[in-house]
Swiss-Prot record:
Biological role: Core subunit of the mitochondrial membrane respiratory chain NADH dehydrogenase (Complex I) which catalyzes electron transfer from NADH through the respiratory chain, using ubiquinone as an electron acceptor.
Family under the similarity heading: Belongs to the complex I subunit 4L family.
Membrane topology qualifier: Multi-pass membrane protein
Classification via InterPro entries: NUOK/Mnh_C1-like
Provenance organism: Branchiostoma lanceolatum (Common lancelet)
This enzyme's EC code(s): 7.1.1.2
Protein name: NADH-ubiquinone oxidoreductase chain 4L
Top-level taxonomic group: Eukaryota
Annotated GO MF terms: NADH dehydrogenase (ubiquinone) activity
Record keywords, A-Z: Electron transport, Membrane, Mitochondrion, Mitochondrion inner membrane, NAD, Respiratory chain, Translocase, Transmembrane, Transmembrane helix, Transport, Ubiquinone
One annotated Gene Ontology cellular component of this protein: mitochondrial inner membrane
Subunit: Core subunit of respiratory chain NADH dehydrogenase (Complex I) which is composed of 45 different subunits.
Catalytic activity: a ubiquinone + NADH + 5 H(+)(in) = a ubiquinol + NAD(+) + 4 H(+)(out)
Localisation: Mitochondrion inner membrane
């Protein structure tokens, strides 16, 4: 269980440090979701059966997040010419 927390914190650190490309931000978010999913899987293996439904919902949301993130990446890279976060006007 400690390793899942460590993976989550590494992904959070990567999210904070890699602010250049949109794809790297999406990969860090996906790594955070996978670590949460694995953590819920470890809890359900240890004897508690109620997180199993939550894990399935989390897996569904992470699949939707990945597909919408990749669609957004394609849209932005076609309209702006690159996926650099510094080239976006977020204000």
């Amino acid at each position: 269980m400690l390793i899942m927390i460590l993976i989550f914190l590494i992904a959070l650190l990567g999210l904070g440090l890699s602010q250049t490309h949109l794809l790297s931000v999406l990969l860090c978010l996906e790594m955070m979701m996978v670590s949460l999913y694995l953590g819920l899987g470890m809890v359900s293996i240890s004897g508690l059966h109620y997180p199993l439904m939550i894990a399935l919902v989390l897996l569904t949301f992470s699949a939707c997040e990945a597909s919408s993130g990749l669609a957004l990446l394609v849209l932005i890279s076609r309209s702006h010419g690159s996926d650099l976060l510094k080239s976006f006007n977020l204000s």
